[in-house]
Amino acid sequence: MFVDRARIYIKAGDGGDGAISFHREKYISKGGPDGGDGGKGGDVIFVVDEGLRTLQDFRYKTRYRAEDGQNGGSSNCSGRSGEDLIIKVPPGTLVKDEQTGRILADLVKPGKKVVIAKGGKGGAGNQHFATPTRQVPSFAKPGEPGEELWVILELKLLADVGLIGFPNVGKSTILSMVTAAQPKIANYHFTTINPNLGVVNIDAENAFVMADIPGLIEGAHQGVGLGHEFLKHIERTKLLIHVVDISGSEGRDPVQDFEVINEELKKYNPVLCERPQIIAANKMDVTGAEENLEKFRKVIEPRGYKIFPVSAASNKGLKELIYYAAQKLKELPDTVLVNDQDNEVVYTAVEEEPFNIRKENGVFVVEGSWVQRLVRSVNFDNYESLQYFQRAIRRKGIVDALESMGINEGDTVRMYDLEFEYFR
């Protein structure tokens, strides 16, 4: 089964804790602090592996975690950084943040590497907190947690040419005739429910990948008839071959069929309407096809479309269609969802204010990424560490901000898991 969507949890490694240590040496009674820093946590890195074709592996394993950094040691020895976790994905994989829907990476080129979750920084050892008035600091900072999130992986087919059209117009038959693919073929709608891929070999030096996109119907852009699942596979094809049942064997008008499919493409993503299209007027061996073809040409050809009369069942006209498609592909650029410059910077948080304060049910709530890191890094059972915390929030302007909001002695302040009464 072709798997094109997966949901996985990724967790970067936590940073190692800084060490609390003091120099010990014979004949030296009072050595200074020499606690080393914790190591950085490992990153979660996605890499494009051209040998992979599906997301099948992610159906069986859904949780991935990089290695934590090691704690610091004595004698100013830093902890070892955690190993990065490499997750291999097939070309064409789109990585999205499940919570925000934001595209984190569009992974196309083989070997492309993107850091999706960054490892936490290692905590500072007590050697960093020595001052003229605090020469033997008895506290250090713990490591910061690594980033964690649920991501959605979507595999958008890396086909050069996509066969589109209503169900049962002959797309699968065309694919089976011009490639070695063996799609399921039957005379009813939605025979194809997963995309089929095949390689079209023109000659020893020229070949391209063709995808049989499952049939679209009116309302596909709203998800009707599995429309969303089918439409997303069209987005990265360079060229579309629009297959039309020119015989009208199912009672539909070929011109109307053509209009409906293009309207669905436009409503789903207007960019798809600009994708070059070749028209394969299929089922020319059926009674009434010649008459319908002339009517179809009069309406569609003036718009600049190239029309190829074909009969997939008898393999007539397909060679001309395929050779023209191969020539057209040479003239077209590759298509991607986001450009490479976007890929170079991914999952970079928008710069936030260091803190914000609001009053909630009489409690002053202080939040912000800097505040969260500070609270996590302080040992409130250690007096020196507590003093460090008090000086830090004063230097950052939190105390002044609280007083400007009218805080009084004895009022409650909450900083994430920390809650305390305010006193000057």
From Swiss-Prot:
Mg(2+) binds at residues 172, 192. Its cofactor is Mg(2+). One of its GO terms (molecular function) is GTPase activity. The keyword Transcription does not apply. Residues 347-424 form the OCT domain. Residues 1-158 form the Obg domain. Gene3D superfamilies: GTP-binding protein OBG, C-terminal domain (3.30.300.350), GTP1/OBG domain (2.70.210.12), P-loop containing nucleotide triphosphate hydrolases (3.40.50.300). GTP binds at residues 165-172, 190-194, 212-215, 282-285, 311-313. GO terms for cellular component: cytoplasm. Residues 159-330 form the OBG-type G domain. Disulfide bonds: none annotated. Belongs to the TRAFAC class OBG-HflX-like GTPase superfamily. OBG GTPase family. Monomer. This is GTPase Obg. It comes from Acetivibrio thermocellus (strain ATCC 27405 / DSM 1237 / JCM 9322 / NBRC 103400 / NCIMB 10682 / NRRL B-4536 / VPI 7372). The lineage of its organism: Bacteria, Bacillati, Bacillota, Clostridia, Eubacteriales.
